[in-house]
Design a protein with these regions (language model features):
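Non-heme Fe(II)-dependent double-stranded beta-helix
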Residues: 1-71
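Active-site rim elements
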Residues: 17-23, 125-128, 148-149
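Short, well-ordered beta-to-alpha junction loops that form the rim of enzyme active sites
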Residues: 53-55, 92, 108, 142-144
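A structural signal for short, well-ordered beta-strand segments
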Residues: 55, 89-91, 159-163
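Non-catalytic surface loops within mature trypsin-like serine protease
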Residues: 59, 93-95, 163-165
Length: 204
């Protein structure tokens, strides 16, 4: 933050740390989303079909790091075929509004040929902020252009999980040890600086 204090903003593999969350991710109220698009999606935990999750904390006064990302698509660092064939689901822990870092999205951008980082000013698709209350769900395709607005009055907490297309017969995905997955995620601390167009993207 502006005082130079490092703040934890993500809880990776949160479903492994919270029995309550692990139970919630198996709840039928979430499970029905698997077929909301007619694609019979499955969870992202390798080999199980269950949904995994990570917790996000949006503190006040954060200056760098993974908390408040500018406009981007989740495949901006690659792996489009893996990240963008399903849905990202946000479970609102605190709710979000104009003052507490609501998620910004550009509806329809998942079907448009646009840059994976920054919002092109010539794009004729309007952006909106998803105002939510505690317990609300947000659902978007990861290929949708979206951003995390910095909270200015109250911090925000949210849990993100996801659903993806099941593997087809003959598909093989290299198994990556959990320790390596954790190390890879830990190295993404400067991803904000690598997203093009970070400056000047604070307004809709």
């Amino acid at each position: 933050d502006s005082q130079g204090v490092q703040q934890a903003v993500r809880v990776l593999f949160f479903h492994e740390q919270s029995a309550a969350l692990a139970e919630l991710l198996r709840d039928s109220r979430l499970g029905w989303l698997a077929n909301i698009t007619g694609d019979n999606l499955v969870g992202s935990v390798e080999g199980s079909g269950w949904m995994g999750a990570e917790g996000l904390i949006k503190p006040l006064d954060i200056k760098t790091g993974l908390s408040d990302l500018p406009w981007h698509k989740d495949c901006g660092q690659g792996r489009h075929s893996y990240y963008c064939n399903g849905l990202t689901i946000g479970i609102s822990v605190t709710g979000a509004d104009e003052r507490s870092g609501a998620l910004g999205v550009v509806p329809g951008s998942h079907r448009a040929y646009v840059q994976t980082a920054r919002r092109d000013p010539s794009l004729d698709l309007p952006a909106i902020k998803l105002v939510s209350q505690t317990g609300d769900l947000t659902v978007h395709c990861s290929d949708t252009l979206h951003r995390a607005y910095p909270p200015i009055e109250r911090p925000r907490k949210v849990v993100y999980t996801g659903l993806q297309q099941p593997l087809m017969q003959g598909d093989l995905i290299e198994e990556v040890p959990v320790e390596q997955q954790r190390a890879t995620r830990a190295r993404l601390t400067n991803v904000r600086d690598r997203i093009a167009g970070a400056a000047g993207q604070d307004s809709l």
